[in-house]
C-alpha cells in the first residue's frame, strides 16, 4: 500500500490523499458470498431518524464475512484480497481444501497464496485463529470474540489490534488500542496479528461529494439553527453557544459519560484512556 497525494487540478482534489493498494482484486466479488443491502438512511422501523447525517450514497452489496472461523483443521488458501465498501479493512477470499469459499478480515502482511488454518493446533502465525487459551501471552491479536461461538466483535477495523496480557482461571485479560483492559473468556477465539490497511487513517477525502458517495450527509452547526431546533440556536446575528456545548437533546457533548451497559461492567478491568 502507498499514499498518493493528488495533484490540485481542482478545488475538490486539492489536499486529497488516496491509499493505493495495487494487490487488490480488480474484478467482481465472489457472487455466492454477496447479499442484498438495504439502506435505512438512519431511520428505525417507524421511519424516525435515529442516526443523523445518513442518506443517499452508492448502491452496495454486503459481503458475508466469516467472523466465527469454525472450520477447524481444514487448511485454506488465500485466493485474493479484495476491497470491501462496507468496512475500513480489506477482506481476503479463502478457498478451503473441501472446496468451500469464505471471506475473512485480511490481517496485515497477508499475501495471495498463503495457507491459513484455524483450531486448537493451528500455528501462531498471522491470519490463523485459535481459542484464547491456546494463544501465548503477549501475542498481538484481532477479531476477538466476546461470547464463545458468537463470532468476532472486537478489533475488526483497519489497523486495529489488541494484546493478550494474562490468563487467570477461565478468563483472559486483553488490552485494546483504546487502553481499556477487558476480561474475555478463554474459550473465545481470536486471530493472530493485526488488521491490515493500517494506512486508512492517513487518507484525506478531499471534497464533500466523496462523503456523499459514502452515504454521509452534511452536519449543520447548532448555532446556525433556530431555537426550536437546537439549544444553541437563535439570537440576533452571529452568536456563540451561550452555554456549555450540548447535543440537540441537551446532553453535554464534551466529556460527559453516556455508557449505560452496566451488565458488562465487571468485564472491564481498566477503563480506556481519556483523550
Swiss-Prot record:
Ribosomal protein found in the keyword field: yes
Judging by the UniProt lineage, the source's domain of life is Bacteria
Give the record's keywords alphabetically.
Answer: Ribonucleoprotein, Ribosomal protein, RNA-binding, rRNA-binding
Q: Disulfide pairs? A: none
**One biological-process term from Gene Ontology?**
cytoplasmic translation
HAMAP family noted in UniProt: Ribosomal_uL2_B
- Quote the function comment for this protein: One of the primary rRNA binding proteins. Required for association of the 30S and 50S subunits to form the 70S ribosome, for tRNA binding and peptide bond formation. It has been suggested to have peptidyltransferase activity; this is somewhat controversial. Makes several contacts with the 16S rRNA in the 70S ribosome.
Could you identify this protein by its name? Large ribosomal subunit protein uL2
Taxonomy, top ranks, is:
Bacteria, Pseudomonadati, Pseudomonadota, Betaproteobacteria, Burkholderiales
Amino acid at each position: 500500500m502507498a499514499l498518493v497525494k493528488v495533484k490540485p487540478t481542482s478545488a475538490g482534489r486539492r489536499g486529497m490523499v488516496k491509499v493505493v493498494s495495487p494487490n487488490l482484486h480488480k474484478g467482481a466479488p465472489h457472487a455466492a458470498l454477496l447479499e442484498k443491502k438495504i439502506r435505512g438512511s438512519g431511520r428505525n422501523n417507524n421511519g424516525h431518524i435515529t442516526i443523523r447525517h445518513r442518506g443517499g450514497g452508492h448502491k452496495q452489496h454486503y459481503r458475508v464475512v466469516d467472523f466465527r472461523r469454525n472450520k477447524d483443521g481444514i487448511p485454506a488458501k488465500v485466493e485474493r484480497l479484495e476491497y470491501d465498501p462496507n468496512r475500513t479493512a480489506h477482506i481476503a477470499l479463502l478457498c478451503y481444501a473441501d472446496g468451500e469459499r469464505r471471506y475473512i478480515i485480511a490481517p496485515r502482511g497477508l499475501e495471495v497464496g498463503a495457507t491459513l488454518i484455524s483450531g486448537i493446533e493451528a500455528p501462531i502465525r498471522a491470519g490463523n485463529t485459535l481459542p484464547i487459551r491456546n494463544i501465548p501471552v503477549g501475542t498481538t491479536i484481532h477479531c476477538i470474540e466476546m461470547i464463545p461461538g458468537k463470532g468476532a466483535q472486537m478489533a475488526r477495523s483497519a489497523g486495529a489490534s489488541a494484546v493478550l496480557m494474562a490468563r487467570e482461571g477461565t478468563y483472559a485479560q486483553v488490552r485494546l488500542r483504546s487502553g481499556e483492559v477487558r476480561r474475555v473468556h478463554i474459550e473465545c477465539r481470536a486471530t493472530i496479528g493485526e488488521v491490515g490497511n493500517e494506512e486508512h487513517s492517513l487518507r484525506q477525502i478531499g471534497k464533500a461529494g466523496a462523503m456523499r458517495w459514502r452515504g454521509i450527509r452534511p452536519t449543520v452547526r447548532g448555532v446556525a439553527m433556530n431555537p426550536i431546533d437546537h439549544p444553541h440556536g437563535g439570537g440576533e446575528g452571529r452568536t456563540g453557544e451561550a452555554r456549555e456545548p450540548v447535543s440537540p437533546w441537551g446532553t453535554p457533548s464534551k466529556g460527559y459519560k453516556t455508557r449505560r451497559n452496566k451488565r458488562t461492567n465487571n468485564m472491564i478491568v481498566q477503563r480506556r484512556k481519556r483523550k
